[in-house]
Amino acid sequence: MNIKPLGDRVVIKALPMEEKTKSGIIMPDTAKEKPQEGEVVAVGPGKMEKGERIVLDVKVGDRVIYSKYAGTEVKYDGQEYLILKETDILAVIG
């Protein structure tokens, strides 16, 4: 991947949503909620604070849960990604 986020930003690839509910109902695209779970594919160097770089807590390969309306959606090489600040990440899964 050639995207390198700046500062405390993280690039995430959203994980696909379930096509069916637990009861077996197939969800149309219009009824699906915006994804909130993804995999970290790139991490910035961290933000500068008082002349020191604060390293991010997440790393490439982490599965994370993030705020529903956080970040900026971008398309690169035919793939869709989300670029957001580390503070928009709510939890690391696993």
Swiss-Prot record:
SUPFAM superfamilies: GroES-like. It comes from the Bacteria. Its main location: cytoplasm. The keyword Chaperone applies. It holds the Pfam family Cpn10. One of its GO terms (biological process) is chaperone cofactor-dependent protein refolding. GO terms for cellular component: cytoplasm. Keywords: Chaperone, Cytoplasm. It is found in: Cytoplasm. Heptamer of 7 subunits arranged in a ring. Interacts with the chaperonin GroEL. Belongs to the GroES chaperonin family. Together with the chaperonin GroEL, plays an essential role in assisting protein folding. The GroEL-GroES system forms a nano-cage that allows encapsulation of the non-native substrate proteins and provides a physical environment optimized to promote and accelerate protein folding. GroES binds to the apical surface of the GroEL ring, thereby capping the opening of the GroEL channel. PANTHER family: 10 KDA HEAT SHOCK PROTEIN, CO-CHAPERONIN GROES. This is Co-chaperonin GroES. It comes from Desulfitobacterium hafniense (strain Y51).
